[in-house]
């Protein structure tokens, strides 16, 4: 995790069992509630949608660009409603989505951005590592991805306000991380 923190210039790195697990953590940390809408590309792996459906969200699929196979940034705004809570750009094959436009829309409508960068390790958008531009970035280390470990993933984010909840989620509802740091006597 220290390598990722330095290499990608990100404050928080949580190694996970998979990108699916990282996406599920990001959905929880984004406070996705039943009835919320989450915008994502129509072309993605099922885990991208499942992570948010498990929280009760309604998925709003948006068409992709034929030149990149990524979400068409020009179609996102028309999909936004008063129930929209997040945008999930998927960086297909290491090709970055148009994050400047996506971040502008997120700011305009006060939406979370969860980057599915499963295929984006060591890929960049205007000098920034994919997965470090939005609120959360999710990576995969599955055998079919850029960096492989057989399985595994990572959740990254900049804001320290999510750290404690992320630690508790990863540690199955306990404050085990605080125990290892000597901040509590037991967990």
Predicted region positions:
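Short loop-beta-helix segment that forms the pyridoxal 5′-phosphate
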Residues: 2-26, 40-43, 62
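Short active-site oxyanion
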Residues: 11-12, 36-37, 152
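PLP-dependent aminotransferase-like
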Residues: 28-92, 96-117, 124
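Radical SAM/AdoMet-radical enzyme domain recognition
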Residues: 105-110, 128-136
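Active-site region of PLP-dependent enzymes
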Residues: 120-126, 133-187
């Amino acid at each position: 995790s220290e390598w990722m923190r330095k290499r990608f210039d990100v404050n928080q790195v949580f190694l996970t069992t998979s990108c699916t697990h990282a996406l599920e953590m990001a959905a929880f940390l984004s406070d996705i509630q039943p009835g919320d809408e989450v915008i994502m590309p129509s072309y993605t792996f099922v885990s991208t949608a499942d992570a948010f459906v498990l929280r009760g969200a309604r998925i709003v699929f948006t068409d992709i660009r034929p030149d990149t196979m990524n979400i068409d940034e020009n179609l996102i705004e028309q999909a936004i409603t008063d129930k929209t809570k997040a945008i999930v750009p998927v960086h297909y094959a290491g090709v970055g989505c148009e994050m400047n436009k996506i971040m502008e829309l997120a700011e305009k409508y006060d939406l979370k951005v969860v980057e599915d960068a499963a295929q984006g390790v060591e890929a960049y958008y205007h000098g920034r590592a994919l997965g470090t531009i939005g609120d959360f970035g999710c990576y995969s280390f599955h055998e079919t991805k850029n960096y492989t470990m057989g399985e595994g993933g990572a959740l990254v984010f900049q804001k320290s306000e999510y750290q404690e909840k992320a630690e508790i989620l990863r540690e199955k509802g306990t404050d085990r991380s605080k125990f290892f740091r000597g901040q509590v006597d037991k967990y």
